[in-house]
């Protein structure tokens, strides 16, 4: 089940409300990524506290471990990971693409060796739909081939040609039809999204988009971006494609990106975003703040008593209030620098909490700006603040 209400617009930017089987999602929204059924380093209750409304699961990796049988035993991913709100699962197409020469693509699907134990596996649109039905995710993604920006090995390959992108895009369209047919055969009560492909070629993007609209999916994603292309190429496709999708359906930009990418994506008509950047960067000492990015490993933070971001209300920056009124948490840059230098587990946990809170709070501010009819003013101030530097 999916219902999308478009509440207000400003230019291409949209404020909406997405109703799914496990709850309501206010858009635009950022979706934290839980590859193996967990958002790394963060408890589910903390995700809810910081405003996460929907999270991602990774079909490919959950198929590898723990497998369909365990997922079926638990009745799906929600009970398995103790998350009661909506979940989106990707189809496995991107992960198969990332295997490189370890996989062989045909009309039927993709053959590859399991990266876990070397078993020979065959992933098809039908199998992807079957796995995602067992996972019982609120939003299911069609099985697609992620069109790469670069063909072949680094330094000896070539940028994907229009002919190569067309072959890949047309295969994804045939797989979209097969995904939809299998999804219907299984009686899956959730929502299936189609994925626009076409590489860096706008004409192919439009061809893919129009064909998917003919198939009439409940929602649509723009895939094949942030796959190694230069930033200006990604921005060109981001400016071209999302606003051409049906206005009455949710629009999802896959795997993007930086805080600036999210705000610019909203301006291009995107409703939904996901990216591993908040947690991956956190584990490497890279923190996002209102006034730019902060590298906590730098020696200049060794004795700095300030929080990461004095405007942030997350547990790492401000702490939380206990029932007896005492405040717990709220840590200095010096302490977080110390944890990072010593390799202490608490360091990346607090950094992940901060980065996710920053992303989720940014999208809350975007929604409030759209509600107030001042999104472009917010966007300008956001960029000025980020450029100021910490």
Swiss-Prot record:
For the biological process aspect of GO, one term held by this record is:
tRNA wobble guanine modification
Which PANTHER family is this protein grouped with? QUEUINE TRNA-RIBOSYLTRANSFERASE (PTHR46499:SF1)
Q: What is its EC number?
A: 2.4.2.29
Q: Which cofactor does it need?
A: Zn(2+)
Binding positions for Zn(2+)? 312, 314, 317, 354
- Which residues does the Swiss-Prot or TrEMBL record annotate as the active site? 90 (proton acceptor), 274 (nucleophile)
- Binding-site residues for substrate, renumbered to this chain: 90-94, 144, 197, 224
UniProt entry tagged with the keyword Transferase = yes
Listed under subunit, the entry gives: Homodimer. Within each dimer, one monomer is responsible for RNA recognition and catalysis, while the other monomer binds to the replacement base PreQ1.
Q: Might you report a single GO cellular component term?
A: cytosol
Q: What is this protein called?
A: Queuine tRNA-ribosyltransferase
Q: Which reaction does it catalyse?
A: 7-aminomethyl-7-carbaguanine + guanosine(34) in tRNA = 7-aminomethyl-7-carbaguanosine(34) in tRNA + guanine
Q: What family does the entry list? A: Belongs to the queuine tRNA-ribosyltransferase family.
- Listed InterPro entries: ArchSynthase1/Queuine_TRR, TGT, TGT-like_sf, tRNA_ribo_trans-like
From the UniProt record, give the pathway where this protein acts: tRNA modification; tRNA-queuosine biosynthesis
Q: Where is this region: RNA binding?
A: 255-261, 279-283
**Keyword Chaperone (UniProt):** no
Give GO terms: molecular function aspect only.
metal ion binding; tRNA-guanosine(34) queuine transglycosylase activity
General function of this protein: Catalyzes the base-exchange of a guanine (G) residue with the queuine precursor 7-aminomethyl-7-deazaguanine (PreQ1) at position 34 (anticodon wobble position) in tRNAs with GU(N) anticodons (tRNA-Asp, -Asn, -His and -Tyr). Catalysis occurs through a double-displacement mechanism. The nucleophile active site attacks the C1' of nucleotide 34 to detach the guanine base from the RNA, forming a covalent enzyme-RNA intermediate. The proton acceptor active site deprotonates the incoming PreQ1, allowing a nucleophilic attack on the C1' of the ribose to form the product.
What keywords sit in the KW lines? Glycosyltransferase, Metal-binding, Queuosine biosynthesis, Transferase, tRNA processing, Zinc
């Amino acid at each position: 089940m999916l219902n999308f209400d478009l509440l207000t617009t400003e230019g291409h930017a949209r404020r909406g409300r997405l109703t799914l089987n496990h709850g309501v999602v206010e858009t635009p929204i950022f979706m934290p990524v839980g590859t193996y059924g967990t958002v790394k380093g963060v408890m589910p209750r903390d995700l809810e506290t910081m405003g996460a409304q929907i999270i991602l699961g990774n079909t490919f990796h959950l198929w590898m471990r723990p497998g369909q049988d365990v997922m079926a035993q638990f009745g799906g991913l929600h009970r398995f990971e103790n998350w009661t709100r909506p979940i989106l699962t990707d189809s496995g197409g991107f992960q198969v693409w990332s295997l490189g020469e370890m996989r062989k693509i045909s009309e039927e699907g993709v053959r590859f060796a399991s990266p876990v134990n070397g078993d020979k596996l065959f992933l098809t649109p039908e199998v992807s739909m079957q796995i995602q039905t067992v996972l019982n995710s609120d939003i299911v993604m069609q099985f697609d081939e992620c069109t790469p920006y670069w063909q072949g090995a680094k330094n000896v390959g070539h940028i994907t040609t229009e002919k190569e992108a067309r072959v890949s895009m047309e295969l994804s369209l045939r797989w979209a039809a097969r995904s939809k047919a299998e999804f219907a055969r299984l009686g899956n009560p959730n929502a299936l999204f189609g994925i626009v492909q076409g590489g860096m070629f706008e004409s192919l993007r439009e061809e893919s988009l129009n064909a998917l609209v003919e198939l009439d999916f409940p929602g649509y994603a723009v895939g094949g971006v942030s796959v190694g292309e230069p930033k200006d190429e990604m921005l060109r496709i981001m400016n071209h494609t999302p606003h051409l999708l049906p206005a009455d359906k949710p629009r999802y930009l896959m795997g993007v990106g930086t805080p600036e990418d999210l705000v610019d994506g909203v301006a291009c008509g995107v409703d939904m975003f996901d990216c591993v950047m908040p947690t991956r960067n956190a584990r490497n000492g890279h923190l996002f703040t209102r006034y730019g990015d902060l590298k906590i490993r730098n020696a200049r933070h060794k004795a700095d008593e300030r929080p990461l971001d004095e405007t942030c209300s997350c547990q790492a920056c401000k702490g939380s209030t206990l029932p007896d009124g005492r405040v717990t948490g709220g840590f200095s840059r010096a302490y977080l620098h110390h944890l990072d230098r010593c390799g202490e587990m608490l360091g990346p946990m607090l950094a992940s909490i901060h980065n996710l809170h920053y992303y989720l709070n940014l999208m809350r501010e975007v929604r409030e700006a759209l509600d107030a009819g001042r999104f472009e003013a917010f966007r300008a101030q956001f960029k000025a603040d980020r450029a100021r530097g910490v």
